[in-house]
Amino acid sequence: FKFGIDLETYFHALMTRITGLTGFFSFFSTYRLIKFMKKFDPDVVHLHELHAYFVNYGTVIKYLKKNNIKTVWTFHCEFMYTGKCGHAYECDRWQTECNQCPQLRNYPKSLFFDFTKIMYLHKKRLFANFDNLIIVTPSKWLGLRVKKSFFKERCIEVINNGIDTENIFYPRDTTRLKEKLGINNEKVVLAVAP
């Protein structure tokens, strides 16, 4: 089920850049998602990222809280506990209260205004009394960061990303492949992916 509307996603991205507010738009897409949830009536909702210009996360959180729906939320970045940053890097303002953001021009980009304090406080209020929320992170590092945020009193679990070391990621004899590609054995081949 695709609830997002492409044109609205572009509008959301534009409005984020103009206003500096992230996650406050996509009204029609969000309405479609909530309409689907009402019809489906889930016992549990498992969320991942909600900040790519496709949903009004505040409306979704309010719906889940109001309807007392058990929610597991896997955080893959720091967006939900910072003013706006996907990754705060060395900035630690999110531990007390975001403002005067040093990453204003980074994703999600704001061209004019710094509303990171408003967005930080908005998120903090949204999550207050969300008793049916469990947060999952795919790494210890992110789990420790979440525990330093306003989520520190929440249930936070680390479930590491799984790696299949028997069928997919295992040492292989690469001699033939190197020969085929014209790479001599003196060179090391390193592949890195996000």
Regions found by a protein language model. Give the residues of each.
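A conserved catalytic-core segment of Leloir-type glycosyltransferases
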Residues: 1-44
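A short, histidine- and acid-enriched strand-loop-helix "catalytic/donor-clamping" loop
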Residues: 49-54, 75-86, 104-111, 165
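Carbohydrate-associated surface elements
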Residues: 141, 162
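Conserved donor-binding/catalytic core segment of Leloir-type glycosyltransferases
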Residues: 136, 182-194
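Short aromatic-enriched loop/helix-cap "lid" or pocket-rim segments at secondary-structure transitions
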Residues: 1-2, 59, 83-88, 93, ...
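A short helix/loop element that forms part of the nucleotide-sugar donor recognition site in Leloir-type
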Residues: 120-123, 169-183
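Membrane-proximal helix-turn-helix segments that form the acceptor-binding/catalytic region
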Residues: 65-66, 70, 79, 94-135, ...
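Short N-terminal targeting/anchoring amphipathic segment
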Residues: 23, 35-55, 69-76
